[in-house]
Design a protein with these regions (language model features):
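Acidic donor-binding loop of glycosyltransferase active sites
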Residues: 174, 279, 295-312, 327
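Nucleotide-activated donor-binding/catalytic signature segment of Leloir-type glycosyltransferases, i.e.
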Residues: 256-258, 265-292
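Conserved donor-binding/catalytic core segment of Leloir-type glycosyltransferases
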Residues: 218-244, 256
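An aromatic- and histidine-rich active-site surface loop
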Residues: 14, 86-96, 109-146
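Donor nucleotide-sugar binding/catalytic pocket of nucleotide-sugar-dependent glycosyltransferases
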Residues: 156-213, 220, 280-282
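A short, well-ordered alpha-helix in the C-terminal region of glycosyltransferases
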Residues: 357, 364, 371-386
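N-terminal subdomain of nucleotide-sugar transferases
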Residues: 1-57
Length: 406
């Protein structure tokens, strides 16, 4: 297959599509990725990508390494304010569509790796309009509901055109794969997508840590909890901080927060105001290859997500990654993730936003860790049965081939 992947975010930005595209090449397919100039999450262009010539050099190097042809569309960096973020969104729409008009008409299929914003898929829609090529989305973020976090309210007057735009973009697809089953209900109800046009393909996680011994290196008489990932508003890390505040400034636990994002500064302020600087530690972004050494510090992994709309029913890819570590998982999260944690018997979960309930779970581990002794093995077993990279790639390849054959 000749596959065109459209995604606003790609390597060296850390998203799972970075593993998917090279694997498609290894399976014998020709892959081109159209993406933006990397600047996520800090809103600053990555070193080595500052100019068009720099990007061309990086594209040549990446092709030699992976066989994936990458084309960077110019875009305004995300910056640090809503105006700059909107410029980022719209500049990618404009410039990615210009790139599309200069591409070969010979692709067999277009795969839109659909994160936020939904406008990042306009280039994929443009290619389909020009050449009639079948279009598939892999939908990780739901729209228009995801726009509520940007517009601050579902009652914002701008939600009306955003809803119209989202419907048009989704309805342009021939096939939509979703990462969580509740997505199907929302896409059908809000965007008018027929059930037969949708399929379920949960995110994968690399299995590299499955065979690693990530048991805690030293038993320091302290329960070490860890959150690893994006520190955005939707992740509700404030629930973890408030849970720590319920436990208080005691010496028998620590919370390690590994990652970066728009809420980091306010979370650090929150920790200081609550007198928890000895209990809650921030490490910033870390390279993926360095993460095993961080997981070794942890007894338990924490997962939280906003729960006031359909976004809170998703199953973040973080959950699958956590499962590969063989650690118990405690969560304050709704929907599919809540169900999987309970079904896998890999930890315990309360509803999204319930910081007191999460504090009770953390206290339970601190006082009786033996209750969770089988959770890590259960997590790895469930992952092997449902979430391996090979399982994911077989499903994606099959879906693409079926769509082309129609």
């Amino acid at each position: 297959m000749k596959i065109l992947i459209v995604t606003q975010y790609y390597s060296p930005e850390q998203f799972q599509i970075n593993e998917i595209a090279p694997e498609l090449v290894r399976r014998g397919h020709e892959v081109t990725v159209l993406c933006g100039v990397p600047n996520y999450p800090k809103g600053i262009v990555f070193q080595g990508y500052e100019t068009a010539d720099n990007c061309k050099q990086k594209e040549r190097e990446y092709y030699k390494q992976t066989g994936v042809r990458v084309i960077h569309a110019k875009q305004h960096p995300r910056g640090h304010n809503p105006f700059s973020l909107l410029r980022n969104y719209f500049s990618f729409v404009k410039n990615s569509k210009e790139v599309i008009r200069n591409l070969s008409p010979n692709f067999d299929v277009v795969l839109g790796y659909q994160l936020s914003p939904i406008t990042s898929m306009y280039a994929a829609v443009e290619y389909k309009k020009l050449y009639g090529t079948p279009l598939m989305y892999y939908t990780l973020d739901l729209w228009p509901v995801s726009a509520e976090s940007i517009l601050k309210s579902s009652k914002n007057p701008l939600m009306l055109p955003v809803t119209w735009m989202s419907r048009k973009i989704y309805q342009s697809a021939d096939r939509i794969l979703v990462t969580s089953l509740p997505f199907m209900d929302y896409l059908s109800r809000v965007n008018g997508i027929e059930r037969e046009r949708m399929g379920y393909l949960p995110q994968h996680a690399g299995g590299g840590m499955m065979l690693m011994d990530l048991q805690k290196e030293t038993h320091n008489g302290c329960a070490d909890f860890m959150f690893a990932g994006n520190l955005g508003k939707g992740q509700r890390i404030d629930v973890i901080v408030n849970a720590a505040a319920e436990l208080g400034a005691r010496t028998d636990y620590k919370v390690h927060i590994v990652g970066d994002g728009s809420m980091r500064s306010s979370l650090e302020t929150m920790v200081k105001e609550k007198g928890l600087t000895n209990n809650v530690v921030f490490y910033g972004n870390q390279k993926r290859d360095d993460m095993p050494s961080f997981y070794k510090k942890a007894d338990v992994l924490l997962i939280t997500l906003r729960g006031n709309n359909e976004v809170g029913n998703t199953m973040p890819g973080k959950l699958q990654m956590y499962m590969t570590t063989g650690k118990p998982i405690l969560g304050a999260i709704n929907g599919a993730a809540n169900e999987v944690i309970k079904e896998a018997e890999c930890g315990a979960c309360v509803d999204a936003g319930n910081y007191k309930g999460l504090a009770d779970l953390m206290k339970s581990y601190i006082e009786s860790p033996e209750k969770y002794k089988d959770c890590g093995a259960n997590a790895r077993r469930y992952f092997t049965e449902h979430f391996t990279f090979e399982h994911y790639m077989n499903g994606l390849e099959r879906e693409l081939q079926t769509l082309i054959a129609k």
